[in-house]
């Protein structure tokens, strides 16, 4: 166990339901290694300020990061309504990559021959295979599998029960709906969204919204300004 004096001080960006799930992951990590001390949440919803989420206080807005210069950060503001905006939000509040940590749930299976970037959250029962490259600011939700030699682009969200086959390339700012399956050797462009249960059999250009089995093009996502 890590002595209290050596624990990493952590602030969670986002005090919504996703933030509470991230807090639960920290709790599970601490049961095994006592690694983190959570100081609080930062959230732009002023109605949450000075209140508690899961017993942890909401201590300010995202801009309040400047008031906590010596703590680690983890981002928990991702969602289907704003997945393409996360990059710009984070650029506005913190440009120092060294301040972000990565959380890997103890039940996840992550190959030692994979690479995981910063500000990533690997949820329970995720499997990440050999030679997988996971970028930065990425969430991989429970029971998802990323197979060998695949690449996951920055700021992407992979929701529950995803299956990414071998040698798949996923671009930046993508959102994969629950249960999405992608066959091997597929290339998916930036800022793409798949509906729940989609089965992707073909390459997808940038800004594609697809759904169904097999996945069919529906429309384009909102352009990233």
Model region roles, listed by residue range:
Residues 102-211, 215-218:
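Structural signal for interior beta-strand "rungs" in well-ordered beta-sheet cores
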Residues 39, 71-72, 172:
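Conserved acidic residues
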Residues 1-51, 59, 66:
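Hydrophobic, well-ordered beta-alpha structural blocks that scaffold small-molecule cofactor pockets
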């Amino acid at each position: 166990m890590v002595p209290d004096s050596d624990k990493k001080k952590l602030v969670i960006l986002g005090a919504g339901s996703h933030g509470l799930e991230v807090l639960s992951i920290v709790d599970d990590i601490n049961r095994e290694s006592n690694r983190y001390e959570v100081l609080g949440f930062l959230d732009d919803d002023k109605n949450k300020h000075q209140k508690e989420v899961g017993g942890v206080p909401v201590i300010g807005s995202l801009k309040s990061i400047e008031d906590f210069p010596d703590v680690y950060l983890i981002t928990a503001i991702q969602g289907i309504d704003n997945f393409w905006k996360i990059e710009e939000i984070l650029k506005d509040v913190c440009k120092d990559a060294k301040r972000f940590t990565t959380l890997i749930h103890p039940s996840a299976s992550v190959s030692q021959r994979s690479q995981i970037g910063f500000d990533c959250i690997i949820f329970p029962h995720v499997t990440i295979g050999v030679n997988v490259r996971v970028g930065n600011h990425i969430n991989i939700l429970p029971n998802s599998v990323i197979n060998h030699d695949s690449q996951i682009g920055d700021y992407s969200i992979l929701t529950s029960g995803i299956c990414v086959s071998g040698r798949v390339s996923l671009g930046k700012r993508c959102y994969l709906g629950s249960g999405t399956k992608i066959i091997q050797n597929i290339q998916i462009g930036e800022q793409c969204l798949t509906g729940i249960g989609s089965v992707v059999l073909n390459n997808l250009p940038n800004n594609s919204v697809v759904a169904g089995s097999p996945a069919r093009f529906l429309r384009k996502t909102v352009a990233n300004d």
